[in-house]
From Swiss-Prot:
Optimum temperature is 37 degrees Celsius. SUPFAM superfamilies: Concanavalin A-like lectins/glucanases. GO terms for molecular function: glycosyltransferase activity; hydrolase activity, hydrolyzing O-glycosyl compounds. Belongs to the glycosyl hydrolase 16 family. CRH1 subfamily. Glycans are attached at residues 28, 96, 190, 196, 233, 237, 261, 297, 310. The keyword Repeat does not apply. Optimum pH is 3.5. The active site is at 166 (nucleophile), 170 (proton donor). Its main location: secreted. Residues 63-280 form the GH16 domain. Its EC number is 3.2.1.14, 2.4.-.-. It is found in: Secreted, Cell wall; Membrane. This is Congo red hypersensitive protein 2.
Amino acid sequence: MAIVNSWLICLVSIFSFVVRVEAATFCNATQACPEDKPCCSQYGECGTGQYCLNNCDVRYSFSHDSCMPVPICKSSSTKFKDYSSKLGNANTFLGNVSEADWLYTGDVLDYDDEESLILAMPKNSGGTVLSSTRAVWYGKVSARIKTSHLAGVVTGFILYSGAGDELDYEFVGADLETAQTNFYWESVLNYTNSANISTTDTFENYHTYELDWHEDYVTWSIDGVVGRTLYKNETYNATTQKYQYPQTPSKVDISIWPGGNSTNAPGTIAWSGGEINWDASDISNPGYYYAIVNEVNITCYDPPSDTKKNGTSAYVYTSSSEFLAKDIAITDDEVMMDSDEGSGLDPHKGATTSSTQKSSSSTATSSSKTSSDHSSSTKKSSKTSSTASSSSSSSSSSSSSSSTATKNGDKVVSSVSSSVTSQTQTTSSVSGSASSSTSSMSGNNAGANVAANWRLTVLCVILGYVL
């Protein structure tokens, strides 16, 4: 009887796990989020808390004010020397921009030899995303980076808005002398929008990639040389009678992600140069694929002259039917929630049952420093967020953790381990949009529930055998 009872407990645990996973509510052009989960995440799932930040999709949320107001642009220059400890964790961040200028999901490491930050993609992971906490509504954004390399590995530098507007640089690891540029308006896929710029080896060399975004035109430049110019008047669509030109406040994302993952759509795999090799030399040494970020500069431009202003702190959408520049206002609305139960509808929900927001930079899943084996004797630190990134989610019940970060040759080595032996990679299809190069975040509550249920299931199985 004890054995039967134990296995019944196991079955209940598994059933609970399945129910919780299947309870996810999705959002898209035909289905908006319900009021109890009002925010549509960038990846098409409804929820509260972090779902209401980080490019919350205003179009498919319960209402246009379900997403949190977006912190207004602030000109800045960020050098990523010894910067990992200053990063906020996107999975715990609740909107307090005084805590962090940049968020991460995935694995990041300081790289002292080049005074830079490594975005790492360990074997079978979804990659890493670095995101700004503030949005840019017209401005000049430049990033000095080294891309990754090899087939199936994609590096991205993009501006992306909660209305699906997008300005892109993407770099396919199989072609290191080409920067792919693209733009999207409200996520509309148009294959004629892309264009390439030739350059020198993007893996071996730092290049400064720049987006100079104005109301009526945008330029893409590499190392100060303009390689492409798009004019707003070129984007007019006679059918919709609208300019299909990126025009809404956008966050800055820099990422590395597995475009060649075998679970991706065939077109995505082909575009990224073929299936990714998870046993490539990089996976042995230094232990992951990587891109390197040295510096990002942001210069904010004035908003359109006819912008409605009732403050100076945040961008808000004023319409649930259109999401154009004319539908953006500048206000002093709150940009921070009190708990992961909050949303734009009620930022203070859950405040009485949750502790005061902690610094997101101090709640990273792990942080470690270790002496270098390299002759420079520099030190490294590494951080790993608690959810998979880059349009990928894992069935792993808990986060990976960086246990070491030592120098080996020219790159930092990170030992990444999982608390579950078996991981199943389920990467979503990418339809040509660089928005898929950013993190797929399931949220703290979902991650905690999955972890708790897996632990209970394993415990029950062990108990069943013992009894």
